Amino acid sequence: MSSPGAGKTTTLTKTIDAMKHDFRIGVMEADIDSAVDADMTRQGLLELDTSDVDLAILENVGNLVCPAEFDTGAVKNAMILSVPEGDDKPLKYPLMFQVCQCLLINKIDVLPYFDFDLEECKKRVLKLNPDMKIIPISARTGEGMDEWIDWLKEETSSWNESNEKGVKE
């Protein structure tokens, strides 16, 4: 989940490229503007042939309000905040930061050119969600992407192992 222009598509493309040899990945575009949309997304996930997919990714169209308000059935939520958006997003959209488990702070390669305080942003996020995994990345240059991929692989493997045993998190 993220705002338009935060780097969802680039991050998603690089993520799939890095994981495609180890995991079978499905992607669903999800425009969550209402409970009806969330219900349709959840139904789509239920109808997905899970025997063919290890990881299903829901990519929202790009806003920080609606996706946080509705349960899509996602096991984990990750969001992308880009440096050009500003370090005050946690103050403006607290719910989004409360419902996610992982935050990618993207476009760190342009940090020197923006008034973005990375440490202050992290403090604001952790005040809202002390358990948030925060990973600074540049999807364009690849910086930080290994940490993101490792986290996602671990979470995916852990869930798949639990699911095979009939355990729901």
Question: Where in the sequence are the language-model features?
Answer:
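Nucleotide-state-sensitive switch-loop elements of NTP-binding domains
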Residues: 1, 6-73, 86-88, 97
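Conserved beta-strand scaffold positions in the cores of enzyme catalytic domains, especially
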Residues: 27, 77, 134-136
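Residue-level signature of catalytic and energy-coupling elements of molecular machines
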Residues: 31, 59, 106, 121, ...
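Hydrophobic transmembrane alpha-helix bundles
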Residues: 35-36, 91-101, 150, 169
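Conserved C-terminal guanine-recognition region of P-loop GTPase G domains, centered on the G4
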Residues: 64-76, 80-132
